[in-house]
Amino acid sequence: TKXXEAPAPKGLKGNEMLKGIFLEVKKKFETA
Protein backbone atom coordinates (compact mmCIF):
# COMPACT_ATOMS: atom_id res chain seq x y z
CA THR A 1 0.00 0.00 0.00
CA LYS A 2 2.92 2.37 0.67
CA UNK A 3 4.00 2.21 -2.99
CA UNK A 4 0.50 3.29 -4.06
CA GLU A 5 0.23 5.96 -1.35
CA ALA A 6 3.61 7.59 -2.00
CA PRO A 7 3.00 9.10 -5.48
CA ALA A 8 -0.25 10.97 -4.72
CA PRO A 9 -0.27 12.55 -1.27
CA LYS A 10 -0.77 16.12 -2.51
CA GLY A 11 -3.69 15.27 -4.79
CA LEU A 12 -5.37 13.21 -2.09
CA LYS A 13 -4.86 15.94 0.50
CA GLY A 14 -6.30 18.59 -1.82
CA ASN A 15 -9.25 16.36 -2.66
CA GLU A 16 -9.99 15.76 1.02
CA MET A 17 -9.81 19.49 1.73
CA LEU A 18 -12.13 20.36 -1.16
CA LYS A 19 -14.52 17.60 -0.07
CA GLY A 20 -14.54 18.96 3.48
CA ILE A 21 -15.20 22.53 2.34
CA PHE A 22 -17.94 21.33 -0.01
CA LEU A 23 -19.63 19.39 2.79
CA GLU A 24 -19.38 22.38 5.15
CA VAL A 25 -21.00 24.71 2.60
CA LYS A 26 -23.66 22.12 1.83
CA LYS A 27 -24.45 21.81 5.54
CA LYS A 28 -24.78 25.58 5.93
CA PHE A 29 -27.15 25.81 2.97
CA GLU A 30 -29.23 22.88 4.21
CA THR A 31 -29.64 24.27 7.73
CA ALA A 32 -30.13 27.90 6.64
From Swiss-Prot:
Keywords: CF(0), Hydrogen ion transport, Ion transport, Membrane, Mitochondrion, Mitochondrion inner membrane, Transport. GO terms for cellular component: mitochondrial inner membrane; proton-transporting ATP synthase complex. The keyword Mitochondrion applies. It is found in: Mitochondrion; Mitochondrion inner membrane. It comes from the Eukaryota. GO terms for biological process: proton transmembrane transport. Its main location: mitochondrion. The keyword Ribosomal protein does not apply. Mitochondrial membrane ATP synthase (F(1)F(0) ATP synthase or Complex V) produces ATP from ADP in the presence of a proton gradient across the membrane which is generated by electron transport complexes of the respiratory chain. F-type ATPases consist of two structural domains, F(1) - containing the extramembraneous catalytic core and F(0) - containing the membrane proton channel, linked together by a central stalk and a peripheral stalk. During catalysis, ATP synthesis in the catalytic domain of F(1) is coupled via a rotary mechanism of the central stalk subunits to proton translocation. This is ATP synthase 28 kDa subunit, mitochondrial.
